[in-house]
Amino acid sequence: MYLTTNYCDFLSRTRIVRRIFLLVYLISNVYAYIVFTETGVLIGDYQGVLIIYKDQVVYLLMLTIMSYYIVCGPVFNCLSKVKIRLRTFKGLNSFAYILFFFQILFAVFNISTGSNAAGTDFQTGGVIRLLWLFLPVDYLFYIYYFVGREKKVSKIYLANVVIFILSMLSRGWLGWTLVLLYAELCFFFYSQKKIKIKYLILLFFLLIVAPLAFSLKIQLRADLYSSGIGGVISTLSNIDYIQSYNNFIAGFLSRIQQLSNIVFFYDHQQELYKFVSSDIVSNYAWEGLPQQTVAKLLGLDPGVDMHIFLYSHYISSTSEAVTTLQVGFISWLFLGTLSSVFYPLFVFAIICISLFLSKKLGGEKLCALTWIMIFLSIMCGWYNAYLVYMQ
């Protein structure tokens, strides 16, 4: 079986999907701004933290929205139009079986050690956990999900999808649903099918189930490894559906908005600049366990990862961090002249490299996947996730 890469109209036919995601993002940040003006405190990861420079919030909102539009709009569109000669690969079926094997190993490792789950300590799983940093099974699945999709879905394709979903649920993550939702919308609009009643029924079903899934996520985060499946069943049987739905909408918008992270970073920019300039905290280029691991092997000390530092220093200074906080795309621009010059160049470079590889290896379908990775990773300031995807 060949990996076909020539999807000439895939990006143009799926443009509406990217516009929908940008619109939802716009709504979430405007929602955050409204909450800020009414309460004077942040939401999301920084819920309850007082805003220091309230007069700058509207300015930061406009910067945030414009950054998303520029990077995910004109910059991506221009780079994706560059013509790259495609490569044709054989053996997609073989790759599918290999991926399925590694997905099972990854799931067994995570369940047996409690590693890679939402809210777990970063040291969980020991040295073996580093193997999965350089063999990113989840990202390999995303790539296969896009380039391996055909009109008639194979059994091994479905098997990979099932094991991926079960693996993600066992770890308490739900962010993957945005990637798969984006993918399915892309496939739907690319096929140019008419909207059928069954799709509307499916959409209605998903809207009904969403609050339950959100509650399930909370249960998995808190009690899966302590209470087991019994705790999940207990939560589901006592759900207040209306309250769950309200919590889901507010929680979803609070989670995907970036304004709260950017406002917090702006309020503390002078202090954070001192930490970065004195190498106590690393800059964007050293963000993530792979880079930090390489630095230690080379005998370097780039400083603490910014995302971990934000949590351990400002949110939970009395305990070791078990989570990370997003920075937001434009936040690094606030840390002096050098950062405001080299940071955009760094971002532009990794976007260029990733789009070149995407067009070379997977054509426009893989470029479409790269867009959602830019949307979810680069625009959140989550460069570790994006660089792992690139590898």
Residue ranges of predicted features:
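N-terminal "leader" segments that precede or initiate the main folded domain
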Residues: M1-K81, V161-F164, T177-A210, L216-K217, ...
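Hydrophobic alpha-helical segments
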Residues: G114, A118, V137-D138, L310-Q391
